[in-house]
Amino acid sequence: MPALNERAHELCEAMAAEADRLGIVVSALGCGTRIIDCGVKTPGSVEAGRRLAHICLAGLGDVFIATTDQDSPTSQAVRVATNAPIAACMASQYAGWEVKGEKFFAMGSGPMRAGACREELFKDIGNCEQPEVCVGVLETRKLPPDAVCTSIAEKCQITPDKLTLLVAPTSSIAGTIQIVARSVETTLHKLHVLGFDLSRIVSGIGKAPLPPVADDDLVAIGRTNDAILYGGDVTLSVRGDDASIAEIGPRVPSNSSPDHGRPFREIFARYNHDFYRIDPLLFSPGLVKFVNVETGQRHAFGQLAPDVLAESFAKK
């Protein structure tokens, strides 16, 4: 199987070839880094967002825009499926890299994380790479300057001209879609925090309602988080014993956190907009199901909260 960055690079090539149709802008910085703007200075599109999410997964998962259930406050949902959950979600999609520079900040995800392999997480999951090319996704409102791109390239041990960065703010079509496409990823991350053996997970399927695109990032952060916290519905196929699933299961969905129950913007404001003060156990889907492929047992934990979603999606 091709390496994560190699797979993502091929997807970027195809995306760049259809830039006009996708509503994106492709450019090169002075240092040589290729920038694919999916929503900073260009409107982007639904398809650009779907492909952005696909690249976040290094192509190891399928991303669909689908219809929602009748009790959802929105008509569309983002569905994700992967048969390589650790590589796709944890080694690539998880936004584990804080990218910083002079007057610049972004949350970094994508397979460049496996190229840099600087996070403690990789000691547990492996999947480090020594790539010839690297691909990253930046959640930010600014396009990265040369200095930031050069720094990323150095950490990935490549030259800047071998780096591709896709950029979209939260309050953009593409940015909203790629965040809502993290239903399975947030489940795996929560399980890792709880000490569950991720190698037991065979595959994952998830969906979350696609909220209206907001006109500012703070509103967008609230809506996209709520989409997963209160509308995320994930099913994991797993191996091993059922007793451990029954024991850990109640701690997996978002309602295991005392912060659960109100729109995320309210929770965020309560903690003075400091993510690190929010209970980390909040960040997981509303409903999580396990299907044991060895015993045939099914376990379900949590519940959806369409009333909270409706309140969140209506707020401006």
What spans do the regions from the language model cover?
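Anaerobic metallocofactor- and corrinoid-dependent redox/one-carbon enzyme cores
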Residues: 1-156, 161-185, 189, 193-316
